[in-house]
């Protein structure tokens, strides 16, 4: 009988004045996951950042190429025949697309390299000094780079 009274006292001690048992502590719930694909919040954020970066790079490339094409097609100095394009226009458009790709890659590789840009965002370095040091340093080169041999 004494064991039953001790158990009863333990059970009563867990009850608050309203009579609700507050001794049960539910296990921690995991972060919100989409059960079908098992995607958590960080994965969604990373995919969003990658999608925005891809959009910016693609938009910059296509916008620069579009501007070059408009300049080439509206050049007053060139007289074109209605059936075709002038070779100078074709060369300018081809070089425009090439320089557009080069400009986009240069902007996102040298200027917006994630590790150095995050150092700037968190106040650990100046962006200008990081960009200048990138031009001088060869820490971006890979093993097969002809520049670093």
Swiss-Prot record:
Its main location: endoplasmic reticulum. Induction: During exponential phase in rich medium and repressed in minimum medium, hyper-osmolar medium or in sporulating conditions. GO terms for biological process: transmembrane transport; water transport. SUPFAM superfamilies: Aquaporin-like. InterPro entries: Aquaporin-like (IPR023271). Residues 69-89 are extracellular. This is Aquaporin-like protein 2. It comes from Saccharomyces cerevisiae (strain ATCC 204508 / S288c) (Baker's yeast).
């Amino acid at each position: 009988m004494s064991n039953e009274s001790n158990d009863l006292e333990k059970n009563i001690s867990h009850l608050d004045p309203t009579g609700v048992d507050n001794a049960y502590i539910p296990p921690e719930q995991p972060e919100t996951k989409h059960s079908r694909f098992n995607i958590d919040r960080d994965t969604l954020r990373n995919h969003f950042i990658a999608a925005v970066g891809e959009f910016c790079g693609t938009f910059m490339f296509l916008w620069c190429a579009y501007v070059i094409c408009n300049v080439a097609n509206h050049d007053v100095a060139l007289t074109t025949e209605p059936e075709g394009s002038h070779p100078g226009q074709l060369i300018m458009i081809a070089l425009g697309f090439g320089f557009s790709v080069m400009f986009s890659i240069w902007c996102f590789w040298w200027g917006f390299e994630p590790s150095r840009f995050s150092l700037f965002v968190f106040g650990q370095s100046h962006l200008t000094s990081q960009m200048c040091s990138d031009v001088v340093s060869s820490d971006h080169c890979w093993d097969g780079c002809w520049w670093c041999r």
